[in-house]
Structures are given as structure tokens and as C-alpha cells.
């Protein structure tokens, strides 16, 4: 037979507490002064494992008149290893305090009543000692300003710097006892640069990615230092062997050679202008014969065809002007038509950056001319897993020099550099630089435009004997520096 036992005193007490919890009610204790809000803290570099090991101190602003500063509060926390500081003002303060409200509730388990108080959240950041931190007394007995910066010999200047940074939110203001302030950082830290101090912080608290980047940078630094040392020793050995004057002379000679790499063969001792830059060096006999069919339209061009070219903008203005003055003689007309066609091809070819495909200018170009353009006026590069023909800046200069020579042979060894420069999309300074390197005589001439205005053009003339060779502006500047 089962017996029914009455509950004991412990069970009665537990039921009373359960009933109280089930019927708990909360009581808001009103909006206190900002200086009396409860303090909630969070740590920026991790979670708190042993709350009992932390020693917290709360500091309130002593300025009760200024409404902006009277609510300023600073929370300091100490452990055996680190100190932490958090404040509710400046750029380091949490924005959530202004956007939302925090509360702390204290539950009385006996009465079932929870008292709710306003709270404020602080973000605690570690404060590193002995990292070259300047301590400046701002006023009062215990108010100081701490900031991470490079040590300054002049304490007054450092104070001005820190005050300006404090207004920008780059400093931390804390309240400390005079005995807790270390006036002089250790000697080993005084010799450290700001970069070294930042690297120490990354070593201690940086992420895996930051530490990996730091190790890579240090390894590269060691490698670059070794390389610089080796280069310096090699340079000293060469200077001791050859001498400074010989090295400067070699450098100037290299500059002169680099400057004429883009020029075609020049015969400076030629007796006639047509022999200085020979036509056969621009177009070989085989290439000249291959232009018979493509240049037929230019050879048979009429005034109506020229007007149509102008309307359709199918050819550049310099080519159209050359077509207007084709000679009547069949032999000379044929030669100039082929030269003008190749000049037009060079101008269109230079406007490109990368040649995609095997055809430089599309269909209709003779194979020998297409091969000439790709081999003589492009550089072979490797990009995105495939080879490409690139028209580099030096190749553009080479195309410009060949275009000038063709224009000289077409127009009795005088070329309108300004008109040709516009079609080549080139600056006047660069055009004159190339023309001078080709040893042309530069002159000015007024040219009448279609609307009646006059424009000053630069003309380049090839005449013998050739004027002295002139270096480019870049080489002249380099020679002056040497």
C-alpha cells in the first residue's frame, strides 16, 4: 500500500521562489544623471576570462559647468599584464551610446522585483607601457594625456602636437597618479622608430594575416639590404677600376645610342638629300612592287574621290593634302601613290596599341607589308597566356620617324611637321624632338586655313650638309646633372 508523504520545508521554500520568479515585475528607477549611469565594458582585443583579476576605476569629469564635458567619463582597468582604457567621448567612443539605450537589471529573487537602471557601454582598449608614450599634464592634479607618437626632445612641442591630435581623436586622456607616470621611456624604446613600435604591436596582438605580412616584409628588407650592399661594393669596384670620368662618358654614349635606335639608317656624308635616308631602306623593291594593287585607288584618284574622302573622313588630312598634289607624270604619280598609301598605313597602324590577330590592318593588306609592320614596328609580349604584338612608345617613335622620311620623299624633302603631328596624335614637343634627332632644319611658316585664318606651322627640311646632331631634351638634362 502506497503512502503519501507531505512536502518538507525545502520544497516549500523552492516553490515560493519559483512563484516569485514567475510573477517577477520590473521597476524602472528613473533617468539618473549621466554621471550616475551603470558602467558596461567590452574589450576590443578579446573576451574577459577571469573577471576577478580585473581592477576597475571610474573617473568623472570635474567640469560641471560645460554641458558637453560634464558627462565625460573614463574607465580604467588593470591586470598584472596590461592596462585598459575606455572613454565615452571623442572618436574612440562607441556610437551605439548615442543611437540606443542600455539598461542593467537587478532581480530580487525573494520579492520578485527587478530594479532597472540606465547603463553606458565602454570599449576597453589596451594601453601599452614603455612604447615611447608621451605623458603631458593638461591641468589639475591628476589629469594627463597619453598618445602613441614618436618621442620629442622638446616637451612643449610634444604637448602642442598631442593636444592637436587629441582634438582629432587620436589621443587617450586618462587620470593617473603622479607616482604611476614614467617620465622617461626606457633607453631601448627611445631608439626605436615608430615603424618598429607598430611592428611590436602586430607581433603581440596582430592577426594571422598581419603577422604573415610582417614576416614577409622583414624578409624582403633583409634581401634588399643584402642586394644594395652587393651593388654598392660592385659599383665601388668599377669606379676604382675605370674612374668617374670614363663612366660618365660611357653613360653619355649609351644615351646617344638609345636616342637613335628608332631612326632608320642615316648616311650623314651623302651628297644629295635623297641619299641621306634612302627610299630602299623604307620600302624594299619587293615591298614596293607589292603596293601596286593596293595603291591603285590613290593613283587613279579624282577630285570627286577626294571630296568623298573628306566627307567620310576615311583618311587623315595630311594624306588627303598629298593626294591633291599628285604629279601628272605617270612614273612619278605611281611612285608617290605607293608612298602615300604606305604613309597612310603607318599612321593607321600607329593609332593601335595591341595588334590582335595576325592581320595588322585587316584584310586587303599584302602579306609582305603585313609581315613588315609586325616585325619592324611591334614588340612581342606575353599576356594572359598568349603572345601579343605590342606597339610600345619606342616603336611609336620609330613609326613617326619612318612617316617623316616618307613625307620628305613625297614632298621634295620638306615636311609640314605640324600637320603630320596632328594626324599622328603626337605632341609638338615630341615631334620636334624626333625631327631634330633626324637632323632636319626646323623653320616656321604661316599657313592659311579653309576659314581664312592663319596658323603658324613648323616645317622640317632635309638638306646637305646636315646640321650637327642634337640630343633630346631628356639626354641634355641628364648630361647637365652628370
Swiss-Prot record:
Q: Which residues carry this modification: Phosphoserine?
A: 226
Task: Please tell me where this protein is predominantly located.
Answer: nucleus
- A Gene Ontology biological process term: nucleolar large rRNA transcription by RNA polymerase I
Cellular component GO terms, alphabetically?
fibrillar center; nucleolus; nucleoplasm; RNA polymerase I complex
Q: Where in the cell is it found?
A: Nucleus, Nucleolus
Q: What GO molecular function terms would the record report?
A: DNA binding; RNA polymerase I general transcription initiation factor binding
Q: How is it modified after translation?
A: Acetylated at Lys-436 by CREBBP/CBP, leading to decreased RNA polymerase I transcription. In normal conditions, deacetylated by SIRT7, promoting the association of RNA polymerase I with the rDNA promoter region and coding region. In response to stress, SIRT7 is released from nucleoli leading to hyperacetylation of POLR1E/PAF53 and decreased association of RNA polymerase I with the rDNA promoter region.
Tell me the domain of life.
Answer: Eukaryota
Stretches assigned to coiled coil: none
Q: Which residues carry this modification: N6-acetyllysine?
A: 436
How is the quaternary structure described?
A: Component of the RNA polymerase I (Pol I) complex consisting of 13 subunits: a ten-subunit catalytic core composed of POLR1A/RPA1, POLR1B/RPA2, POLR1C/RPAC1, POLR1D/RPAC2, POLR1H/RPA12, POLR2E/RPABC1, POLR2F/RPABC2, POLR2H/RPABC3, POLR2K/RPABC4 and POLR2L/RPABC5; a mobile stalk subunit POLR1F/RPA43 protruding from the core and additional subunits homologous to general transcription factors POLR1E/RPA49 and POLR1G/RPA34. Forms a heterodimer with POLR1G/RPA34. Interacts with POLR1G. Also binds UBTF/UBF. Interacts with PWP1.
Q: What is this protein called?
A: DNA-directed RNA polymerase I subunit RPA49
Q: Which organism is it from?
A: Mus musculus
